Structure formats: C-alpha cells, structure tokens
C-alpha cells in the first residue's frame, strides 16, 4: 500500500473517535459482536465519511484487514464492485462474524457484482446461517431491482 493510502487509512481511523457512540458499542459487545475495536459509529455517519472518498480497491482491502467494525463497513462502501472478484468475496465472507456485517457486505457491495446471482444461490444453499443471510439479502436486492432468476435460480430460491 502506498504511503498516501496509509495516511488516508490513519485519517479514517482517527475520525472514528469524534463519531463514537459508547452506548451502542457496549450494547453490541454485550450481544456478542466482537471486534478488536468497535466505536459504535452509526451507519449515517459512516456513509457520510465514505462519501468523502472515491471507490478504491487498495484502501478497501486495507480497511477490511483491520479488525475494526467501522473499517470493515467502510470497506464494503469503498470497494469498487467491478474489482471485487469472487475469490475476495469468499475470503471476506469467511471473515464475517455478525449479522450486521453480512447485511453490509450484501447491501453495500455484493448486490452490484456481476456474479451476484451465483453467490446468492450458492450461499442460500449453505448450512452456515451468516452465508444464508447474506445470500438472501443479495437475492432480495436483485429482485427489488427488477432482476428475474433463471430456472436454476427459481429452483434454488424455492428450495
């Protein structure tokens, strides 16, 4: 990662302190949502922060590597969908530890990738609850955007 990207990452991480919500963070921790750091920043503030930056593959990868809730959510907002290949999607999904993150990954990023229907059906058929949730979120967004499933997709959806 370039020095410039590293500085942007540091700037982003510093900005969380001013937006922190200790009550929300504590509540999430009590409910079992574990991250190295969880500032409890709400999604509105994270969207406003993300709007200050262009989509950026390197920055998104660096953000995702941080075990910080807000960094991971921002990564889903800043990753260009056309650069998010299926292998990275699988790696990120393996690292999802909460319902919130499965939803953020689906709604902010994976619904926009070219292979969205394929991973949605695959994950819906998984025996892992977070994969299922993410798959159903993706397919729900695709349906709400007017996409129609093919015959295989219909069979997967009704099973």
Which functions belong to the PLM regions below?
Residues 1-159:
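Alpha-helical scaffold domains
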